[in-house]
């Protein structure tokens, strides 16, 4: 029955994408500066060649990113201000061939909030944003949504890794992410409405699945939480230097690899 439902869900997603013709986009209201990646001294710092000068830039995404951050690839930087900043730039995106991929882990939350406010996510059209960064127990979740007298706890996860058309999360071991889905699953088991929304920050994915090779614990925790009632959804977007374009929902496969 579960496999039959998954096939039906994939068919519905494909039909929705086929008949959804209106572009949904969020404008980017700042300028980018293009450079080429040199190296990454630590998780939060990149060195970039910008017009012949070597500059240091803050990296918002602390993930592994080895498939993306290769010497010489094109990088988009944003100029930052603030007297306490250690760098004057932040690394916002990277080109994988002609595909632009966001490296800003805050963008999925901002884009999700925009889509929720505009009621553009079909499966969340009836929900309003009630609170952000809402605590529950020892955890904090991105959104609390409200529909009449019903509440939902929503956690958003950023996805940047795609291999052979399959989006995968995480790209490195995430104990925090594992605890998040375990807690959401326990809440769902008690009758509390919970959802984890994976936002794929690139347009070249056809399917989502856990990254079993690098973090099987997260994959098993997600699958178990899903079986307990945690709702799992996946959307994806396309980034250009001028906007973020919503591409709709993606199908997923959470079945553990044998």
Predicted regions: what they are:
Residues 66, 97-130:
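Acidic-basic catalytic patches of nuclease active cores, encompassing PD-(D/E)XK
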Residues 201-258:
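Domain-level recognition of nuclease-like catalytic cores that cleave nucleotide substrates
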Residues 64-75:
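Short nucleic-acid-contacting surface segments enriched for D/E, G, S/T with interspersed K/R
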Residues 165-175, 182-214, 236:
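Nucleic-acid nuclease catalytic cores
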Residues 39, 79-84:
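Short, charged beta-turn/beta-strand-edge "cap" motif at the junction between a beta-strand
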Residues 35, 141-171, 184:
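Conserved catalytic cores of phosphodiester-cleaving nucleases, focusing on short active-site segments
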């Amino acid at each position: 029955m579960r496999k039959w439902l998954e096939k039906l869900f994939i068919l519905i997603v494909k039909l929705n994408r086929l008949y959804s013709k209106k572009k949904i986009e969020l404008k980017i209201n700042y300028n980018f500066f293009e450079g080429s990646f040199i190296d990454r001294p630590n998780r939060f710092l990149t060195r970039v060649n910008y017009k012949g000068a070597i500059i240091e830039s803050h990296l918002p995404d602390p993930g592994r990113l080895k498939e993306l951050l290769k010497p010489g690839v094109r990088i988009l930087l944003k100029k930052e201000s603030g007297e306490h900043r250690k760098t004057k730039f932040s690394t916002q995106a990277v080109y994988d061939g002609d595909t632009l991929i966001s490296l800003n882990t805050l963008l999925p939350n901002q884009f999700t909030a925009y889509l929720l406010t505009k009621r553009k996510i079909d499966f969340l059209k009836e929900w309003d944003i009630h609170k952000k960064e809402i605590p529950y127990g020892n955890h904090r979740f991105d959104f609390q949504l409200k529909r009449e007298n019903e509440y939902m706890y929503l956690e958003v996860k950023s996805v940047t890794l795609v291999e052979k058309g399959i989006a995968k999360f995480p790209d490195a071991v995430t104990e925090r992410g594992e605890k998040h889905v375990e807690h959401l699953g326990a809440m769902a088991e008690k009758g509390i409405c919970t959802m984890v929304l994976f936002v794929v920050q690139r347009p070249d994915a056809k399917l989502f699945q856990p990254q079993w090779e690098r973090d099987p614990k997260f994959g098993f925790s997600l699958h178990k939480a899903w079986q307990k009632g945690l709702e799992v959804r996946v959307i994806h977007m396309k980034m250009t230097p001028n906007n973020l374009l919503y591409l709709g929902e993606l199908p997923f496969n959470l079945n553990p690899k044998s």
